């Protein structure tokens, strides 16, 4: 029998995308988790040459049968009790996502203390980039299984089927998720801050309601890919090590902003002007120190 998590092992099964070049999905999640003391077993939902923000991308998309086969191998070798966490990100196939639901249940049978962190990657800035058929699977089958949810503002609107255009609407949405069994919900970014400022929110059942204002970096039209994936992995790590949600939230944002700052600094003209997709890849490896030792500059505001 494989050693169980009762011995203090920190191991993540991470089911999301993989790219050969660049940093999104498992490529951006694995390194920070390892730096913060976790073993990571990446299971790829797709394997692309690069992320989809380039002019072209190539590579295969995994299906639910391939996922089931790989997981079966883990199960037959009695490895399931080793996992302390499940992390899921980009999944583009509704049947693949449904299979993830079966995986959550099997992992919980092997380790009732498993923590499931779900990043429901579906779109951003009003643009849906997965098949709409994923929505009911997330809403009805996956969301109720999650312990921690890390959507962006647009994904919150997709899941709740309500616009989120005010802070009152944010807390209504948070309550919608809590009623479905999710203990901790973090909206990783929203446009509800002042001009030039993103606003992130956190809500925990019987816990604090928090917000952090995050100044945008670089040119006004500069967009980075993989930041949500990085956010989810950092939040997973810090929430395991501390139950102080304000501190967890602050450290997550601190490391994320440090990575973005280093990335912007490497851009031509600081990102003011045209920037190629390859130039916008996150400077992850170069940010090792900021990931291991986050310097908190942006403090959480308690709103309850």
Q: Where do the protein language model's features map onto the residues?
A:
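Glycine-rich phosphate/adenosyl-contacting loop at the front of the ribokinase-like
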Residues: 1-62, 291-304
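Glycine-rich, highly charged phosphate/nucleotide-binding loops
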Residues: 58-76
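N-terminal glycine-rich phosphate/adenylate-binding segment common to multiple enzyme folds
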Residues: 80-108, 120-124
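A short helix->loop->beta-strand "cap" motif at the edges of active sites that frequently abuts
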Residues: 107-116, 180-183
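Conserved phosphate/ATP/ADP-binding segment of small-molecule kinases
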Residues: 129-211, 218-220, 241-246
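Short glycine/serine- and small hydrophobic-enriched flexible loop segments
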Residues: 233-241, 254, 258
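Charged C-terminal helix
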Residues: 246-304
